[in-house]
Amino acid sequence: MTESMKYVAHGAGGEPQVMHMAVTDVPAPAAGEVLIKVAYAGVNRPDCLQRSGRYPPPPGASPILGLEASGHVVALGEGVTRWKVGDLVCGLANGGAYAEFVAIPQGQVLPVPTGLSLLQAAALPENYFTVWTNVFQRGKLQANETFLVHGGSSGIGLTAIQLAKAFGARVICTVGNEEKIRACLAAGADLAINYRTQDFAKEVMDATDQKGVNIILDMVGGDYMQRNINCLSVDGRLVQIAFLQPSKTEVDWIGLMVKRLTFTGSTLRPRTAADKAQMANELHEKVWPLLQQGKCLPVVHQVFDLTEATQAHELMESSTHIGKIMLKVAGG
């Protein structure tokens, strides 16, 4: 196997144009890690934040961008028993996926679901780990509950819509134009609201006979916070996973007390390897069968070559995409 590899470097950080191709050593898999020859890598908003210098990798993580990849296993670290060389896999990386090879802890690696391509498989880890841990583990979404997801046409949004419907929930989402409304309805949403032309809180209350929704998955923050409180039901849950608006805002907490609301949230990357392995096990048991049955499928908006990472980040930051933005490395 080659000793060097190409990867996307981003120097000290900045705008998308700072990214460029460079060469470095192929990482040696540490104990408990598998080395994957990357077929495709997913592009996620945390990649853009890291590139711009606003989201440094946690201690010990690869400084190379990229949090998810698919490909085949080419080497095993000491103590790896779950995988063998040649296995087709996808994985949640701690960093390093914008490269020809990436090392990932074995517990964060999953088989490519039967019937899915390597491209589709690379679009799974970041979104499915995020939605599973936040909507189902922390938010405790149940069948017959009503679920509101903001950013419904994003990769996370479309994943949340599909999974919530597969588990029997009613789904409402917010998006910014008619094309995105159509995409969300096609993914299974019961109602899609254009937040640019409608007051989503009023629309939600009207659609729920003034009862509100049981759970909200929010990645916007800012002035959405008060409106989220206003349209949650009694005993409702708000799960915050990102802030596209400022993270500091002013709210009236009376609604939280009167409705007995629960606020929670999480970030995925800093979680321990044990946490991520537990998430992976649950996904393999409860969600991978749905993927193999075609009940949930990733939506890929556009595929760029690894050398076109700048264009991929520009598209991500434009927020005009629907679904996942992907990078082709070896392909397949």
What is the role of each PLM region?
Residues T2-M5, W288, Q293-Q302, T310-G332:
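C-terminal capping/lid region of NAD(P)-dependent oxidoreductase domains
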Residues A122-L124, Y128-T197:
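Mid-domain Rossmann-like dinucleotide-binding core that forms the NAD(H)/NADP(H) cofactor-binding site
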Residues F200-Q210:
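Short amphipathic alpha-helix with an adjacent loop that forms part of the alpha/beta core around
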Residues V175, D223-K295, K328-G332:
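Glycine-rich phosphate-binding loop and adjacent beta-alpha segment
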Residues V18, R82, L88-G151:
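NAD(P)H dinucleotide-binding glycine-rich loop of Rossmann-like/cofactor-binding domains
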Residues D25-G42, R54-G96:
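Glycine-rich beta-strand-centered segment in the early N-terminal region that forms part
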Residues L88, T146, R170, G236-R237, ...:
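Short glycine-centered segments of the SAM/dcSAM-binding site in methyltransferase folds
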Residues C90, L148, I193, I216-L217:
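N-terminal Rossmann-like NAD(P) cofactor-binding module of classical short-chain dehydrogenase/reductase
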